[in-house]
From Swiss-Prot:
Catalyzes the condensation of ATP and 5-phosphoribose 1-diphosphate to form N'-(5'-phosphoribosyl)-ATP (PR-ATP). Has a crucial role in the pathway because the rate of histidine biosynthesis seems to be controlled primarily by regulation of HisG enzymatic activity. It comes from Nitratidesulfovibrio vulgaris (strain DP4). One of its GO terms (biological process) is L-histidine biosynthetic process. This is ATP phosphoribosyltransferase. It is found in: Cytoplasm. The lineage of its organism: Bacteria, Pseudomonadati, Thermodesulfobacteriota, Desulfovibrionia, Desulfovibrionales.
Length: 293
């Protein structure tokens, strides 16, 4: 059974926008944006796409304005929206690692622990989560909402500390700040409206989106290797391959050769290929993967 009316997909606008559109493209959904238009085209008749602020997507999905979308776990906690969390998708603006909301102070300040900030001003965009963090720790602070340029608040003397999101810590350090605590570890999540999730046809579509997004992310860390191996070297080549991976081994028309194919972690290829060559493999081909399901 097909979906009668297209489902509304929320795509985060801003820092996650390009990474999300690229991930969707690798998953099979091409997004075509129009200048100053929040309704990009998508190559799926069962979906319509909308660009929304990442902070607003949880509320829109709870209210049924959107059926499914991608947002941050941080903003889901901040809004407290009642939605279905379909899956964690660990990617961010520049990496496939979680981001961190950290508590940071001026590099030359005397503060070394959250407790040192009792009675002080803390600026952040993540107001509710930050208030709960200090309340749970029993520390009374004045948490103030920051409308942007949060890193500059301490430098300008507008706050004693900030809670800000970072992937690498580079921007924090560039502003002369020092991290004294981690408030929250966050990543992208795929979320769905509860009514949409309970509808069998719409749920099937949401699960399709999840399956292919997960497959594209998994493929990011893997590569495929193909090679030809003479029979006399087969055992030596197989001994070099990671023990957790089971290669495909097929005989060639010339029965003194085998074709070997395997998927391995991208991080080991640099060292693995020379070892395979030394063990007797020839015609080694490395190729990228779009999805691994």
């Amino acid at each position: 059974m097909s979906i009668r009316t297209p489902m509304k997909l929320g795509i985060p606008k801003g820092s996650l926008e390009e990474a999300t559109i690229n991930l969707l493209a690798r998953s099979g959904w091409k997004i075509r944006k129009h200048h100053r238009n929040y309704f990009p085209e998508i190559n799926d008749p069962e979906l319509t796409a909308r660009l929304c602020r990442v902070q607003e997507i949880p509320r829109y999905i709870e209210d049924g304005i959107l059926d499914v979308g991608l947002t941050g776990k941080d903003w889901l906690l901040e809004t407290g929206s009642d939605v279905v969390v379909v899956s964690d998708l660990v990617y961010s603006k520049v990496s496939n690692r979680p981001a961190r909301w950290v508590l940071a102070v001026a590099g030359d300040s005397p503060y070394t622990r959250p407790e040192d900030l009792a009675g002080k001003r803390v600026a952040t965009e993540l107001l509710g989560v930050t208030k709960r963090y200090f309340a749970d720790a029993g520390i009374e602070v004045n948490v103030q909402y920051s409308w942007g340029a949060t890193e500059a608040k301490v430098v300008e003397g507008l706050a004693d500390a900030i809670v800000e999101v970072t992937e690498t810590g580079t921007t924090i350090k560039a502003h002369g700040l020092r991290i004294i605590s981690e408030v929250l570890l966050t990543n992208t999540v795929l979320i769905a409206n509860r009514a949409a999730w309970e509808d069998p046809c719409r749920r099937r579509k949401i699960e399709q989106i999840d399956l292919l997004l997960q497959g594209a992310l998994r493929a990011d860390s893997l590569v495929g290797l193909k090679m030809n191996v003479p029979t006399r070297c087969l055992d030596a080549v197989l001994d070099q391959l990671p023990s957790l991976n089971s290669p495909t081994v097929a005989g060639l028309r010339d029965n003194t050769w085998f074709a070997v194919e395997i998927v391995v972690d991208n991080g080991v290829v640099r060292d693995l290929i020379p070892r395979l060559r030394e063990a007797g493999a020839e015609g080694i081909i490395e190729y990228a993967l779009n999805k691994v399901i």
